[in-house]
Regions:
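Catalytic metal-binding/acid-base residues of hydrolase active sites
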Residues: 207-208, 254, 297, 301-302, ...
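Glycine-rich tight-turn/loop motif centered on a GG-T
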Residues: 169-170, 217-223
Length: 370
């Protein structure tokens, strides 16, 4: 058995206590021949900070890029950055060009890189694309692109928000192949103009959001499992025709409970793991598509407290995915309003209280969700 032994003195900790019990030594044995988790990527998302940071002076941009992406050390041996292995890039839907008519707040509007004529416009999303290039320059090996909404010229309400609609995909019923062509052209444009290869594409972000993407917060659309499957099949066909090796990631769920059952939505946007990856789900099974990763993706919101619940749902999801031969990826996390333990997500908090809270969620995702 290969082991590593770490001996840590407890004197520093004990000195801060009212009554020290003397010098004690703790010994930890790490069994490196018995791995418990496999970490494929450690990444972060660009939405929406990089639309601003990407316009800063070049020296400041490079400093931020080093913090995020660098695996180098300075002369003193101190790491320059955290060495992310994946960068998650948002392909915009065009709410920025609509301005106030978009019904979306300015900070989360995005430009659209592919116009109604089907051509890639290299003048669009330049700030966000700058960080794609900076990531590649620093050796980030993988790029995941995702969409919150189809482009506004393909949606039913001609908006990138779902306001005024129900719980179905905001896409014209005859525009599925056009949407797949849009995504494919965006991927090809990033390769041509920025020398950036998109390894993974997530065509529908959080389609099960129980709020149905209503209101001014951001771009977004719901989608039923049947609609998700139809989008995936059309995109798989388009990627194949274009000769692209990009893999499709589904379903980027907003709530892990929607992957395993019905939660605050109807049956059409529930049980997503079985719907998309069980061969018994003949209408919605996407496992035969050449480009589809055998992966179910979700976001670590709404299931983080209490601790027992956080642990149990991740174990249930891990086991259910294994039975179907599918891996689980956690692809998004930030502080939300339900995180009452640390103040509900408003404002800024650089204290260890918030840091430890986030670390606990990451720990549970890795250890129990694998």
């Amino acid at each position: 058995m290969t082991t590593k032994t770490i001996t840590a003195s407890a004197l520093a900790l004990l000195a801060a206590m009212p009554s020290a019990a003397g010098g004690s030594v703790a010994t930890y044995t790490i069994q490196t021949d018995k791995p418990r988790q496999t970490v494929l990527h450690f990444g972060a998302s660009d939405a929406w900070s990089m639309k601003y940071v990407g316009r800063w002076p070049e020296a400041e941009q490079r400093k931020v890029a080093d913090w995020l992406f660098s695996t180098d050390c300075d002369e003193a041996g101190k790491p320059k950055g955290i060495g992310l292995s994946l960068w998650r890039f948002n392909i915009g839907a065009g709410s920025e060009e609509q301005g106030e008519a978009s019904m979306i707040q300015p900070s989360t509007r995005t430009e659209c890189m592919v116009g109604p004529d089907g051509k890639f416009n290299p003048a669009k999303q330049q700030a966000e694309r700058q960080f794609l290039r900076l990531a590649r320059e620093r050796g980030v090996p993988h790029i995941l692109a995702f969409l919150n909404s189809p482009p506004v010229y393909l949606t039913q309400n001609k908006l990138a928000t779902n306001t005024g609609r129900g719980g179905t995909l905001n896409l014209g019923s005859d525009r599925y192949d056009d949407f797949a062509a849009f995504v494919t052209t965006a991927i090809e444009g990033l390769e041509r103009y920025d020398s950036v290869t998109v390894d993974y594409i997530s065509p529908l972000n959080e389609p099960d959001g129980h709020w149905n993407w209503l209101g001014p917060k951001q771009e977004g659309t719901p989608a039923t499992n049947r609609e998700v499957a139809r989008v995936v099949r059309c995109l798989d066909n388009r990627l194949g025709k274009a000769g692209l090796q990009t893999k499709i990631l589904v379903n980027e769920s907003s709530d892990l409970r929607c992957l395993l059952g019905t939660h605050m939505t109807d049956w059409q946007r529930a049980n997503e793991l079985r719907a998309l990856f069980s061969k018994d789900s003949t209408d919605t099974y996407v496992g035969r598509c050449r480009s589809v990763l055998p992966v179910i993706a979700g976001h670590s919101y709404w299931t983080n407290t209490p601790t027992d619940t956080m642990r149990n749902i991740r174990m249930r999801l891990r086991d259910a995915a294994r039975r179907l031969g599918v891996d689980y990826w956690q692809t998004e996390l930030c502080i939300m309003s339900n995180d009452v333990e640390i103040g509900g997500g408003g404002g800024y908090d650089f204290s260890m209280k918030t840091a430890l809270y986030v670390a606990r969620v990451i720990h549970h995702d890795m250890v129990y969700g694998n």
